[in-house]
Every structure is written in C-alpha cells, then in structure tokens.
UniProtKB/Swiss-Prot annotation:
EC number: 2.1.2.3, 3.5.4.10
Identification of the protein by name: Bifunctional purine biosynthesis protein PurH
Metabolic or biological pathway: Purine metabolism; IMP biosynthesis via de novo pathway; 5-formamido-1-(5-phospho-D-ribosyl)imidazole-4-carboxamide from 5-amino-1-(5-phospho-D-ribosyl)imidazole-4-carboxamide (10-formyl THF route): step 1/1; Purine metabolism; IMP biosynthesis via de novo pathway; IMP from 5-formamido-1-(5-phospho-D-ribosyl)imidazole-4-carboxamide: step 1/1
Gene3D superfamilies per the UniProt record, alphabetical: 3.40.140.20, Methylglyoxal synthase-like domain (3.40.50.1380)
UniProt free text on domains: The IMP cyclohydrolase activity resides in the N-terminal region.
Protein family: Belongs to the PurH family.
UniProt entry tagged with the keyword Transferase: yes
Origin species: Streptococcus pneumoniae serotype 2 (strain D39 / NCTC 7466)
Recorded catalytic activity of this chain's protein: (6R)-10-formyltetrahydrofolate + 5-amino-1-(5-phospho-beta-D-ribosyl)imidazole-4-carboxamide = 5-formamido-1-(5-phospho-D-ribosyl)imidazole-4-carboxamide + (6S)-5,6,7,8-tetrahydrofolate; IMP + H2O = 5-formamido-1-(5-phospho-D-ribosyl)imidazole-4-carboxamide
Keyword entries, A-Z: Hydrolase, Multifunctional enzyme, Purine biosynthesis, Transferase
Keyword Transferase: yes
GO CC term (a single one): cytosol
Any single biological process term in GO: 'de novo' IMP biosynthetic process
Length: 515
C-alpha cells in the first residue's frame, strides 16, 4: 500500500528537499495552500487538500483540514479491524506521516505595530488539530513539527521503510509540548488583553536557552529557560561578548544585580554583588569614579563577584576593573579600547552587554517562586516612592547631606536579604548586614563592616525595628541618621531612643523584605 504524508508548514526551511526524498521513497504527498505552491514550483507532485476532503478551502483558509477524511485518516488505529472497516466504508484513506508547523502567532504579537485582529488571525486551528490527532495515534502515525527532525525520519524510512516506535513516541511528546506552549502563549496574550491579573488557571511557556553543566551545586541538574515572549531588559536577553558560559549561580547573581541598578537610573552607578547581596554600590558624576566607590565599599567581598554598570565602560574604567577578579561584568556598552583591555587580560571573564532602555518594561513582570507542590506569584517590589511622602518622626530633622544619603540608602536596602541593614553615605555603601535572623545582629554586622568610615554615615533597615536596642547600637556607633519603614507596636520606644541620642529618624511607610 502506498504511504501518504500530509505536509502543511509555515516554516518552509528544508521542506522541498524533505518532500523530494519522500517522493523517491514512493510516498504520496497531500499539501495545502502556500506549501503546495512551494512544492509544485519545485517540481514535487502533490495532491491538493480539497481533492482529499471533497470540500474547497474557504473563509480565507480558516476551514480546509477540519474534515473526517483528514482526521479519520490520522486517528484510525491500524490494530483495530473496526477502525479499518469504518475507514474503508467511508472511503477514508490512511495518512502515515504528518509534517505541520503552526501559524507564527509568537512572531506576530512581537511586532511593534501588531493589531488585535492580526493576532487573532494568526491563531492556528487546523494545524494543532492535525498534530494532536497524529500524536495521539503515534502507534501508527509519525508526526513532525520541527524541521530539525527531518533527517532522522528520512534515515529511518530509508533504512526500514518505517520509523521506529521510539522515534514516533519521542516526536509525539515534542508535539504535545509544542501545542501546549502554543496554546499557553495564546492564553497569556488574551489574559493580558482582558486585564485579568489573577486567572484561575496559570499557563506559562518558556523556551530552553541553555543546558547547564549543573545547578546551584554540582550534584544538582539544571537548565536555563527564557520566556517565550522575551523581556528585553533581562539576563536572558543579555549579549555575551566574552568568557565561559554563565553558570546557574552566575545567572541568579546577575539577575539580582540588574534589578538593583534599575533603581539608580539618574547618575552613573556601579553595583558589585556576591551571593545575591550587594557588596558595593557606588554613584558619581562619571562611571570611573562610580567604580572606585563601589570597589572601595568592600574590596574583600567583591573578589569573585559581579559588577553591573549603567553607563558605557571606557578604557580608564576597564583598566581599573581588570585588576580585580570578577566573574561577570554587565554594562550597556563598551568602547573598543575597553573591551580589548578586558578581553586581552581576562580570557575567561564573562562580559555581557545589556542595553538599559527597557528597564521600565521589565518591572511589570510577575515574580514566580517555586515551593514543593506549588508556585507563588507576586508582582515585583517596584513601588514608586517619593521622599515627599516620608515622615521625620524625631525632633531633629535630617541635614541636606543626610537627606541625600538617606535616599541613597533606601534605594540600596531594598535588595539586601532580610533581616537587612545597610550603612551608606550619599554616594556609596559602607557596610552591609544581610540575612541575620535577628535585626540587631544585622545592625552590628553592617556597622562592623563600615568601621572607621562612620563619620557622616546613615543607616537603613528593610523593616521596622522591633525594639529600641537597634537604635541603641546605632547611636553607640556614632551614626546620626536612620531610615526605616516604621510600623512596629514599639515604634515610640525607638523614636524616644533616637531623640535621647540626638538622632534623626525617617519613616517611609513601605517595607522591603527580601527572602
């Protein structure tokens, strides 16, 4: 019996050659629309889909393959006489191979000028239906959705006259992943169009970007996936210019660092980060000086860390950076001279370019946190805050210099692991106290790190002080200005302690836990 293949593809790469080889093997080819035109023009004999269905394509191609003569030919089980008898009685010829890829919905909605009508028109109906029918009946039917699989299918058909069950099963699994992702993307688009923020069913689709050597530790397997609709301002979208592949920990740290630098848009800024915590943030009128400040914040912890800059890296800055062991440098761009300095002296240094013109768009993305058996979803902590909304709760008002430093510190503390404390001046971090299980321990840690640089320093806390002992420690160190959310039932005790020691304390009313 002559074998039949149905070919209907939007991605025509390699399809002519594939069809020509099938013809050499004696296959009949059914085809549709533009695919049939392409094959006919290449001299490949095909059967029109309406010759199989006995029904013309209609409604601008919306209805062409949704017909029993197609789906009966795909779904009939070859091991059931009743199925074969039904096919014979209804003059349905069996289809043994389906080669289909889908309307380019993703590519359509990524166009800047796409209309809603364009998006709707590029939702494929017949294609997924054929793919799913063929995949369901993979015991008998081979289904191909990816041109990368043409070669293996041809090799097996040439060698054995048919594909192996293992190949058909693998290709069926790929199809169900593909159609599920396709539908998930459509669902995501429509959910956004109707403004539904808390759907009862959450469907997400991501594409494999990088198979990783291992995860957080060598004994853990890991892979890196990118959103099917990419976010421009993202570590997943950064362009790597030099160095080894990013590791699992590199990616997590880089993501944390570029989130931090989003909040420092106005002036040249450098963020140094290690193990998801900032170890140095420097801000100045030029990027070279900003690097100096970030490095001086903690010259020890920056070793083996990440540096993110929000301005182009010039040669002078590159000369200073190359003398420090860094895992990654991320910047919007690099001068040719700067790139040459970094690459020539650091062959394995991971150098990434990430334009900063899409920062705002990145802030609207939801955050997903996996738990065993579930997924937590929240919006990002990107609330717009203004010092005009803050409240000075002590008798003493901050000086102009203290006010500037407090604003800088408040931006920085948001990214320190809780319980988080940070000590800064108006242009650089001086001490970081992250992740302690009691707040006073974080206070002591940050102050100890700042040591002899406390003159004129201020302190920020990511959450309220539960007891006045925190203020006592701060006053003892000589720090005169504090910024914190407030909100404790014992706030008054902290205020009275601050007044007692002549401190100024600002309440922001916004907590910034980070776990």
């Amino acid at each position: 019996m002559t074998k039949r293949v149905l070919i209907s593809v939007s991605d025509k790469a390699g399809i002519v050659e594939f069809a020509q080889e099938l013809k050499k093997l004696g296959w009949e080819i059914i085809s549709t629309g533009g695919t049939k035109v392409a094959l006919d023009n290449a001299g490949v004999e095909t059967i029109a889909i309406d010759d199989v269905t006995g029904f013309p394509e209609m409604m601008d191609g919306r209805v062409k393959t949704l017909h029993p003569n197609i789906h009966g030919g795909l779904l009939a089980r070859r091991d059931l006489d009743s199925h074969l008898e039904a096919a014979n009685e209804n003059q349905i010829e069996l289809i043994d191979l389906v080669v289909v890829n889908l309307y380019p919905f993703k590519e359509t909605i990524l166009k800047p000028d796409v209309t809603y009508a364009d998006a709707v028109e590029n939702i494929d109906i017949g294609g997924p239906s054929m793919l799913r029918s063929a995949a369901k009946n993979h015991a008998s039917v081979t289904v191909v959705v990816d041109p990368a699989d043409y070669t293996v299918v041809l090799d097996e058909l040439s060698a054995n006259g048919e594909t192996t069950y293992e190949t058909r099963q693998r290709l069926a699994a790929k199809v169900f992943r593909h159609t599920a992702a396709y539908d998930a993307l459509i669902a995501e688009y429509f959910t956004a169009q109707v403004g539904e923020s808390k759907p009862e069913k959450l469907t997400l689709t991501y594409d494999l970007k990088q198979a990783m050597r291992y995860g957080e530790n060598p004994q853990q397997d890991a892979d890196f996936y990118q959103k099917a609709l990419p976010t421009d301002y993202s570590i997943a979208s950064a362009k790597q210019l030099n160095g080894k592949e990013l590791s699992f920990n590199n990616i997590r740290d880089a993501d944390a660092a570029i989130r931090i630098i989003r909040d420092f848009k106005d002036r040249p800024t450098v963020v140094a980060l290690k193990h998801m915590n900032p170890c140095g943030i420097g801000q100045a009128d030029d990027i070279e000086t900003a690097w100096d400040y970030a490095y001086e914040s903690d010259p020890v912890s920056i070793f083996g860390g990440i540096a993110v800059l929000n301005r182009e890296v010039d040669a002078a800055t590159a000369e200073k950076m190359h003398g420090v062991f860094l895992e990654i440098i991320i910047a919007p761009s690099y001068t040719d001279e700067a790139l040459a300095i970094l690459i020539n002296k650091k062959k394995n240094l991971r150098i990434l370019a990430l334009p900063f013109n899409a920062q705002e768009a990145s802030e609207v993305e939801a955050e997903y946190t996996g738990v065993v058996g579930g997924l937590l979803v929240q919006n990002q902590d990107v609330v717009k805050e203004s010092p005009a909304d803050w409240q000075v709760v002590t008798k003493r008002q901050p000086t102009e210099t203290e006010a500037t430093a407090l604003e800088f510190a408040w931006k920085a503390i948001k990214y320190v692991k809780s319980n988080g404390i940070i000590v800064t001046n108006d242009h650089m971090t001086l001490g970081v106290g992250p992740g302690q299980t009691n707040r006073v321990a974080s206070v002591r840690l940050a102050i100890d790190q700042a040591k002899d640089r406390l003159d004129g320093a201020v302190l920020a806390s990511d959450a309220f002080f539960p007891f006045a002992d925190n203020v006592e420690e701060i006053a003892k160190a000589g720090i005169k200005a504090i910024i914190q959310p407030g909100g404790s039932v014992r706030d008054q005790e902290s205020i009275e302690a601050a007044d007692k020691y002549g401190l100024t304390m600002v309440f922001t009313g916004v907590r910034h836990f980070r776990h």
